[in-house]
């Protein structure tokens, strides 16, 4: 289905409810620049570096698009998807069945779930929705629960320390969304809905957060304007 949620005035803050879940794949593909390409890069990289039968956990898996891509590249992997939206997981489970992919789904709060012994943890545009006061503790939990030499992949929307540059990047991004078919009104309504819900960090803040959480290295492996994908190693 096509994302037309913000064609009407918003009545509440943004949340991943049934209405969002039904259009999520269209929404994210049109809202995140090079989403398909960056997701494919993540899956290609993981398919090369993960050991046989590795345990891979996607926290905030939404409709499982990335996990399905990973399954197609490495059918031996043990895949787990966690999300707190039943509507998202209903779609994810249906897609997994259609593709014949064995993926273990769990509907729970990613801050509370158990993923000990994972060889890879993925947070694809998820960390930015966690309250800043809880992010450091959560990232420490990820590092502690990863296996030795485990990999942490996280994708995030960014802000820039240079406020003028940040403003320019936001305007470039909004031009991108217009080119994807969103009206100025829809863009403005979604921006209002996400205020105080999506709270981005700078690239350096994200890297520092990972290093302070115990990861031995962290690199940006993909970046476009105010979007980036990071890989950290335990």
Segment roles from a protein language model:
Residues 57, 64-111:
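Class I SAM-dependent methyltransferase SAM/SAH-binding core
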Residues 149-157:
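Conserved beta-strand signature within the Rossmann-like core of class I S-adenosyl-L-methionine
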Residues 122:
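A conserved beta-strand element that flanks and buttresses the S-adenosyl-L-methionine
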Residues 136-148:
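A short glycine-rich, Lys/Arg-flanked "PGG" loop and its adjoining helix->strand segment in the class I
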Residues 158-209:
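C-terminal alpha-helical "lid/dimerization" subdomain adjacent to the S-adenosyl-L-methionine
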Residues 1-23:
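N-terminal, positively charged/glycine-rich alpha-helical extensions of SAM-dependent methyltransferases
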Residues 34-52:
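Conserved alpha-helix/loop element of class I SAM-dependent methyltransferases that forms part
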Residues 216-234:
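Core SAM-dependent methyltransferase catalytic element
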């Amino acid at each position: 289905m096509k994302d037309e949620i913000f064609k009407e005035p918003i009545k509440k803050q943004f949340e991943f409810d049934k209405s969002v879940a039904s259009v999520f794949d269209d929404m994210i593909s049109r809202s995140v620049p090079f989403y398909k390409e960056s997701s494919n890069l993540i899956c290609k990289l993981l398919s090369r570096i993960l050991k046989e039968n590795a345990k891979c956990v996607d926290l905030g898996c939404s409709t499982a698009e990335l996990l399905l891509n990973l399954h197609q590249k490495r059918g031996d992997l043990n895949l787990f998807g966690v999300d707190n939206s039943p509507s998202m997981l209903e779609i994810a489970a249906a897609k997994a069945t259609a593709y014949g992919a064995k993926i273990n789904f769990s509907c729970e709060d990613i801050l509370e779930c158990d993923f000990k012994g994972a060889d890879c943890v993925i947070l694809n545009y998820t960390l930015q929705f966690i309250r800043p006061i809880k992010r450091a503790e959560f990232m420490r939990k990820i590092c502690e629960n990863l296996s030795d030499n485990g990999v942490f992949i996280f994708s995030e929307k960014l802000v820039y320390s240079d406020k003028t540059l940040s403003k320019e990047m936001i305007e470039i991004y909004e031009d991108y969304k217009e080119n994807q078919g969103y009206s100025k009104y829809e863009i403005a309504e979604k921006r209002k809905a996400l205020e105080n819900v999506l709270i981005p960090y700078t690239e350096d803040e994200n890297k520092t957060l990972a290093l302070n959480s115990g990861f031995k290295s962290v690199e940006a492996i993909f970046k476009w304007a105010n979007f980036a994908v990071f890989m950290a190693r335990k």
